Structure formats: C-alpha cells, structure tokens
C-alpha cells in the first residue's frame, strides 16, 4: 500500500461488516489509525480490532442515532489518538415498504439512522476539525438517492436528504478547510446481500439476474467502495467538495432497465 493516510485518524461508523469493514481495513492498510464502531459489541468487533492492531485501532460501541453516544465516540477517539481527520458516516439501515403500509416507528428509525445518524457524526467531529483547520467527511449514501424504485419507501427519501446535507455542509465549511462528500453505491456484494441471495428460491439465478441489469454485467465489491472513500478522504482530492460519486457500474445512467 502507498500509506496515503499515514498520520491520519479516521472514524468509520458501522465498520464491523460490509462496506464499513472494507473501508476500515483499507484505511488501516494505508497508515491510518482507525476508530471502529457498531451498535452492538460482538465477537466480530474484537476480531477486527485484533486484525488491525490494538495500538492502531479503537472500538467504540455507539448507536449513531444517539447524539450523546456519537459525541462520546468522537471524544474517545481524540483522547486516544489526539485528533480526528476523517469521518466516514457509513452506518445505515434499509427500510423498504409501500408508503401507506409503512409504520410510524419504521419511518422514524429510518431517518434517525440514515440521516440524523450522519448529522450526529458530523456534529460530533466538526468542532475539532474546524479547530485544526482541516478535515474530510464522507457520507455513504446510495443509488436510491438518485433513482426511485417502487416499494422502497422511505429509504430513498432519507438518502436524497443525506446527499443534500452533504452538499450543504460542504459549502458551509469549505473556506475553513473542511471537505464533505458522499458516495452512492449500487448493488455491492456484502454479507447482507449474500443472505438475500441465499433466501431466494434459486440464489444463482437471482445473482445472475441482478448482474445482467448492469452495463458491466457484474456486481460491485465492498473494496471498490473503500477505494473511492480512500481517494475522497485523502490529500489526493483537495479540490473535491460537496459532491456525490456514484458507484453502481453505470446502471443509474441507463434509460431502459
């Protein structure tokens, strides 16, 4: 690896599985000290800490929907590593339903995690980033923040809002050294997606069907999202701010599907 994050300190929320784990691993490989996070303290979290190295990683249990918990996460990171250079707001949840069938509880929880969770993270780290005059925040949005699929309400509403918040914060603090960007993944093969395939009557047929929908005829990998997060978080992207990058194999640009 090129050690593009040598000397940097990163917080990655929702980092014990899937895209978040791939980002945490890549950042650590590039020299960063990484604070891992999950809303549950399980064996996976401890195993990942051991993998990354206890001297260069920290695990903080926190629900991103809890503002006080996120402030504690930021404070513990600064106490341990002295600063925060990078925040990856990756933690999220899928809530897919028909609008009038959606429960009030699911509506509130979707926004609490997918939108307010990212704001809680940003609000917790921005004071220290502003004090040091530099910082990069990357929000993991979704292709659902660009295209609407029936039956997926209210997830796309939250992700559209997250992209809007990305742009607003990026503009608000650009002159003070802060960059805020987002990434919108399409279908990325994580453990959650593998479980979806496994639950289908013909898992391989469903996998092939999904791949056939993409111009490149293959599904995405978590490591590909991690590579983009690395670029946006690093000093290689100093003039990229308040924007969103789609990682969906080109599917969102197709007129017909």
Model regions: which residues?
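Substrate-binding pocket helix/loop in short-chain dehydrogenase/reductase
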Residues: 98-99, 103-111, 210
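Active-site helix of classical SDR
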Residues: 122, 158, 166
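Residue(s) in the substrate-gating loop at a strand-loop-helix junction
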Residues: 142
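Alpha-helical segment proximal to the catalytic Tyr-Lys
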Residues: 127, 171-175, 238
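Short C-terminal tail/terminal secondary-structure segment
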Residues: 147, 230, 241-257
């Amino acid at each position: 690896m090129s050690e593009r994050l040598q000397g940097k300190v990163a917080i990655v929320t929702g980092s014990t599985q899937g895209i978040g784990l791939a980002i945490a691993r890549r950042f650590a490989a590039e020299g960063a000290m990484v604070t891992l996070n999950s809303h549950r303290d399980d064996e996976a979290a401890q195993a990942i800490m051991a993998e990354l190295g206890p001297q260069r990683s920290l695990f903080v249990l926190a629900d991103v929907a809890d503002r006080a918990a996120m402030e504690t996460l930021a404070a513990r990171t600064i106490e341990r590593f002295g600063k925060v250079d990078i925040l990856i707001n990756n933690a999220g949840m899928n809530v897919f339903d028909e609008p009038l069938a959606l429960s009030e509880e699911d509506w509130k929880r979707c926004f609490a995690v997918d939108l307010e969770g990212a704001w809680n993270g940003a609000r917790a780290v921005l004071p220290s980033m502003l004090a040091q005059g530099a910082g990069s925040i990357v929000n993991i949005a979704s292709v659902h923040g660009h295209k609407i699929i029936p039956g997926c309400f209210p997830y796309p509403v939250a992700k559209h809002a997250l992209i809007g918040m990305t742009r607003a914060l990026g503009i608000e603090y650009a002159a003070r050294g802060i960059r805020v960007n987002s990434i919108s993944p399409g279908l990325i093969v994580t453990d959650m997606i593998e479980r979806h395939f496994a639950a289908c009557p013909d898992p391989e047929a469903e996998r092939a069907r999904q791949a056939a929908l993409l111009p490149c005829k293959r599904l995405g990998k978590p490591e590909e999202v991690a590579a983009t997060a690395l670029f946006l978080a690093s000093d290689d992207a100093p003039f990229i701010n308040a924007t969103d990058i789609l990682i969906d194999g080109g599917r969102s640009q197709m007129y017909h599907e």
